[in-house]
Regions:
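N-terminal structured helix/loop subdomain that forms the ligand-binding/catalytic interface
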Residues: 1-196, 435, 445-447
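Phosphate/pyrophosphate-binding active-site loops
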Residues: 2-76, 80, 213-343
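Residue-level detector of well-ordered alpha-helical segments, enriched
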Residues: 122, 126, 163-166, 186, ...
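Short alpha-helical scaffolding segments that buttress acidic/His motifs in well-ordered protein cores
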Residues: 130-131, 150, 190-194, 204-208, ...
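Short coil/turn segments at secondary-structure boundaries
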Residues: 142-147, 182-189, 201-212, 239-242, ...
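Short, conserved phosphate-binding/catalytic loop or strand-edge motifs used
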Residues: 143-153, 164-171, 206-211, 223-224, ...
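Solvent-exposed, amphipathic alpha-helical segments
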Residues: 148-152, 166-177, 223-233, 307, ...
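C-terminal regulatory or interaction extensions
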Residues: 249-257, 263-397, 401-447
């Protein structure tokens, strides 16, 4: 017995000496939030003569102590080494806060999107997301046909088109759905609406590839309850509501919660979460498309430091999925940057168009005002009666004004239900730029 006590004391003293080593503590602190492949970690300079395998486990232990879910929250029937956890590093929280500040309802981007969401360049982002989700579900629709169904609201002619028309209708009421309690009944309603009149549609889903390391997931009978819990309490899975929305999305992607149309259901649930937690602008960030590109190895360092399926750190303390969450946050940030650039460019083009319109001396003030309105709302369709009432002029004058705008190549026209209607040319910016260039005298330089 005395020998055992002596051995225990010696072991404790040795362990404390190791843990109190300043160089070792510095190494652990530097690597706690710096995720590397195990092989790369083993090549790092170690403190003193420390064993790299021991340092790998020590760093993993520190991460596990800060990880979620806690050991108490996990299934005790599974050994710790088989359990999955994640952390939210300070850099991740700062990144999430920055994303929220740029995409919340009061942000300039969100206010601009309220005016510009019907512009083709903005709609393209939503179409990319729908195409990626459709690909995942084994439903392929040509891009132009999808655009007509979603953007032009053309009546669907096939079961595939009907599916996307149903998705469009759900998207139109997504903000309203976000104000309702999220429960299994709401999920069932959304799935039923999405699948309406698609019984004849045969699909072969293309699920996400399995990661190289097996990641525990909730039992199938608990999966929907887990998703509901994460949507009802966005901070359940971490210290930030947007982090929780990403965890929920990954749960649906990796462990399909729906036998049919899992990809589109994930998209709808995530977009609903964006509205519920106050980041509506993020629905124009095609996260599904970026994740799909990552799976296909179409993106790599520096945009994706780790390969898809390998963004996991495995130790005797469990499977740490933090690198995966870091990648999703990076994708959101990168997608938001792209969205901001597109919005800024769209606004710049609109202002340039209106400037050129008001500089055109061939146009009356009425015509200039109408064209400016159409630039701000390209989906607006006018007829002679509307123009007549707007400017309080005779019908003959209204018709002459509109016909003149057609002849000048500003408007397009057709007869619909025995009424002539007019709308802005889709390529109006190109038409105006060409006309401006043609009317500007060529500059000359003197040798």
């Amino acid at each position: 017995m005395p020998m055992k006590g002596f051995a225990d004391a010696a072991a404790l003293e040795s362990a404390l000496a190791l843990l109190h080593d300043a160089e070792l503590m510095e190494f652990v602190q530097e690597h706690q939030h710096n995720y590397l492949y195990r092989a790369d970690f083993m090549k790092e300079p170690m403190p003193g003569d420390a064993d790299p395998a021991l340092m790998w486990e020590l760093v993993s232990f520190v991460r596990r102590m800060a990880g979620r879910p806690t050991v108490r929250e996990l299934n005790k029937s599974q050994p710790i080494g088989r359990q999955c956890f994640w952390t939210a590093t300070p850099e991740m929280i700062a990144g999430l806060n920055d994303i929220v500040s740029r995409s919340n309802p009061s942000a300039q981007l969100t206010q601009s999107l309220a005016r510009l969401s019907t512009r083709p360049a903005i709609q393209q982002l939503a179409l990319e997301e729908l195409e990626a989700a459709g690909y995942r579900d084994g439903v392929d629709v040509e891009h132009e046909e999808l655009r007509e169904i979603v953007c032009d609201k053309r009546a669907p002619e096939t079961p595939e088109e009907r599916l996307f028309a149903n998705a469009r209708e759900l998207i139109e009421e997504i903000e309203e759905l976000a104000s309702e309690p999220f429960n299994v009944e709401l999920i069932a309603y959304m799935h039923e609406r999405l699948a309406l009149d698609t019984k004849g549609l045969r699909v072969e889903p293309r699920p996400s590839p399995a990661p190289k390391t097996s990641v525990p997931s909730p039992p199938s009978d608990q999966l929907l309850e887990s998703i509901v819990a994460g949507c009802e309490n966005p901070c359940l899975w971490g210290p930030h509501p947007l982090f929780g929305a990403l965890i929920n999305a990954d749960t649906i992607w990796v462990t399909p919660a729906f036998e049919r149309f899992n990809g589109l259901m994930e998209l709808l649930i995530r977009w609903r979460s964006y509205y519920a937690i106050g980041v509506p602008a993020l629905r124009f960030v095609p996260l599904s498309k970026m994740r799909l590109d990552w799976e296909r190895r179409l993106v790599g360092p520096p945009d994706a430091p780790m390969r898809y399926g390998e963004a996991l750190v495995v130790s005797s303390f469990g499977v740490d999925s933090t690198p995966y969450s870091q990648q999703m946050i990076h994708f959101l940030d990168r997608g938001l940057n792209r969205l901001e650039r597109i919005v800024a460019r769209t606004e710049e083009i609109g202002e340039r168009c209106k400037h050129l319109i008001f500089e055109d001396r061939r146009l009356t003030l009425r015509q200039k005002q109408l064209l400016a309105d159409l630039v701000d709302n390209p989906l607006l369709v006018v007829d002679v009666g509307m123009y007549e009432k707007r400017f309080d002029i005779a019908a003959s004058t209204a018709r002459a004004d509109l016909t003149r705008l057609v002849s000048l190549n500003f408007l397009l026209t057709e007869f619909s239900a025995k009424k002539q209607v007019f709308w802005l040319r889709p390529d109006i910016s190109r038409v105006l730029a060409s006309r401006s260039a043609a009317s500007t005298p060529a500059s000359s330089t003197q040798a």
